[in-house]
A protein has these predicted regions:
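Positively charged n-region of N-terminal signal peptides that target proteins for export
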Residues: 1-4
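N-terminal signal peptide c-region/cleavage motif recognized by signal peptidases
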Residues: 14-16
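Tandem repeat scaffolds
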Residues: 20-245
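Sec-dependent N-terminal signal peptides
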Residues: 6-8
Length: 245
């Protein structure tokens, strides 16, 4: 038993039993707000929860497949290990939210305010972050392949070792973001602002960097082979051992 608990801990899986509050669940099912509630482990799949207030509520390990959180207040809520495939968070106020280890393929965060939220090791392949506020997010080792995040603001975001293969990031801002060793092969970063970004060992092979701005960025040991560098501006970026061909 001890060995099993150690294995679960190493995998980032909590051994705590998650039991939602029946009173909170009934409140939600009745169409009410649920501030600082406990919905951990609850199945809320496909429910329309749009426009409600869930600030500080615990959704850890909840099942939220295709759940509608559009225009909700979710500040300080927790979604650790939640299953959120195709969930909708369009226009949500979701600052300082914890999405650690959450699985949300195809989730829609268009126009959401996600500032200072934590996506550590979250799996969000194909999620939409169009025009989303992602300032100061923590997304180390997050799986963000094929996300659609045109015009999103990743300023000061922490994204080391993140997977962003084939991500659509046109006109996105990464000012002062940490993208150390991030995987951005075949990503579209045309017109993106990478000013002062930390991109040591970042993989940008075959990416589209047309009109992108890298002034004062750190590109040491980055891989830009076969990238589209049409009108790309490097300014004072450092490029020690950067691979261009």
């Amino acid at each position: 038993m001890k060995k099993l608990l150690i294995l679960l801990a190493c995998l980032g899986i909590s051994t705590t039993a998650f039991a939602y509050s029946n009173a909170d669940l009934e409140k939600v099912q009745a169409g009410s707000n649920c501030v600082n509630g406990d919905l951990s482990g609850a199945d809320l799949s496909a429910l329309d929860l749009s426009g409600r207030n869930f600030e500080g509520t615990n959704f850890n390990q909840a099942r939220l497949v295709s759940t509608n959180f559009n225009n909700t207040s979710l500040n300080d809520a927790k979604f650790d290990h939640a299953l959120m495939n195709n969930a909708k968070f369009r226009g949500a106020d979701a600052t300082n939210v914890s999405f650690k280890y959450a699985v949300g393929a195809g989730a829609d965060f268009t126009n959401a305010d996600l500032a200072a939220s934590n996506f550590y090791r979250a799996q969000l392949r194909g999620a939409k972050f169009l025009n989303a506020n992602l300032k100061h997010i923590e997304a180390q080792e997050a799986s963000l392949d094929s996300i659609i995040a045109d015009y999103a603001n990743f300023s000061n975001a922490n994204l080391p070792y993140a997977w962003m293969y084939k991500a659509q990031l046109k006109n996105a801002s990464f000012n002062y973001a940490n993208l150390y060793s991030a995987k951005l092969q075949h990503a579209d970063l045309s017109d993106a602002d990478m000013t002062s970004a930390k991109m040591g060992k970042t993989n940008l092979r075959s990416s589209i960097l047309a009109n992108a701005k890298f002034n004062a960025a750190v590109l040491d040991n980055a891989d830009l082979r076969n990238a589209d560098l049409t009108y790309t501006e490097f300014g004072t970026a450092t490029k020690m051992n950067t691979k261009f061909e």
